Amino acid sequence: MPRSAAVKRILDTLRFFWNSPQGPEPDATGYHAFIIIFSTCRPAAAPVNANCQTVDSAFLLAGALTVAIYFDAETADEHEIRTLADALYRRADWQWAQNQGATVTHGWKPESGFLKYRWEGYDEALLLYMLGLGSPTHPLPESSYAAWASTYRWEQCYGYEYLYAGPGCGD
């Protein structure tokens, strides 16, 4: 793919997330800068089972920050990529995602509020915690990482102790 085509696709994506509505309303695509995903989308109807997934949002933000580093040319479009990626990252409210707990929740639903599950064990939430702890605007407290790390599961095999991270999202 030519660089110019990649820049266009990236800008379309970043502009969409930056300009789309944030909030608990049915047409929102995010809340506190965490993206809303859907298990079922039906044309001309409200999405079914919409929820903000904290780790999926972390993947999106990590990708945005990555392309912001890669696309470093001094052009208006590539400057906009860097600006939008930084703005999206700064908008994410990691403290809100804790819902007053020690660790980060899995997400939030417009109809019912925060999901009851929290990130536990060594899993993909490592990226979520790195982004949250490093946030220049709404950082997670250092204690949240210690709380998450305290849920790691350690195993022994052939006399060696290791950090377990099995299939199924760290189960």
Where on the chain are the PLM-derived regions?
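Ser/Thr/Asn(+Pro)-rich, low-complexity disordered segments
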Residues: M1-D171
